[in-house]
């Protein structure tokens, strides 16, 4: 029976610890694999990524370009028809609240968009913020309705 105190790592999954400074013949004696002197041989002797020895670094030499709107852009969550087919019964009304209850939409979002990936055989009444043309066509072919909140 598997118990916490009997669990062992797979063979070859763990590396042996390097024993540094244990004599010259160990292969890791004297300088312990750090070479001779210099900043990288000292304790705490690492330089930050991108540091070029005092020269103006590349990321500061290149010009700033473009515009970044990630803090203010709308977060639109995607739902596919295949997910609706799997979760909802025929005749159901699908909106943001029912999608959250079914765990198809999680976390904060500004809008929900329905995409046409998959097939739909049930007639559903879908109320979303955005819908693709293929999704709208498939829902209406299955006998359902699509209401877009931004158009209403």
Swiss-Prot record:
Q: Which PANTHER family does its entry note? A: 50S RIBOSOMAL PROTEIN L15, LARGE RIBOSOMAL SUBUNIT PROTEIN UL15M
Q: Name one GO cellular component term.
A: cytosolic large ribosomal subunit
What is the protein's quaternary organization?
Part of the 50S ribosomal subunit.
Q: Keyword Ribosomal protein, does the record have it?
A: yes
Q: What is this protein called?
A: Large ribosomal subunit protein uL15
Q: Which Pfam families match?
A: Ribosomal_L27A
Q: What does this protein do?
A: Binds to the 23S rRNA.
Compositional bias segments (type: Gly residues): 24-36
